[in-house]
Amino acid sequence: MATYAIVKTGGKQYKVAVGDVVKIEKLDFEPGAKVSLPVTLVVDGATVTTNAKALAKVAVTGKVLEHTKGPKIRIHKFKNKTGYHKRQGHRQQLTVLKVTGIK
């Protein structure tokens, strides 16, 4: 079995392994910068580590590839009988991260 980790960033959790490219919530780093993310769980073959003291020594390192935007989400507010319509769109800002190591 391969080694993987669950990292928490931007209020979400992601399953990552070395070499994975993941889109996460925007981080304030320039493209090419190295990033370290906090780990919630590590699976190394048959052993699963969830102990907080052991996980304090573990970090997932990655490299920021680029900043991009997610798909457009359209919001439409409507109130009956008043003629009130409001259309709005939103694109979430994302960071593309390549995982370089789990240490």
Curated annotation (Swiss-Prot):
GO biological process: translation
Domain of life of the organism encoding this protein: Bacteria
SUPFAM superfamilies (alphabetical): L21p-like (SSF141091)
Keywords: Ribonucleoprotein, Ribosomal protein, RNA-binding, rRNA-binding
Coiled-coil spans in chain: none
Any one GO molecular-function label of the UniProt entry: structural constituent of ribosome
GO cellular component, one term: ribosome
Function text: This protein binds to 23S rRNA in the presence of protein L20.
Family of this protein: Belongs to the bacterial ribosomal protein bL21 family.
Subunit structure: Part of the 50S ribosomal subunit. Contacts protein L20.
Record's protein name: Large ribosomal subunit protein bL21
Biological source species: Mycobacterium leprae (strain TN)
Lineage: Bacteria, Bacillati, Actinomycetota, Actinomycetes, Mycobacteriales
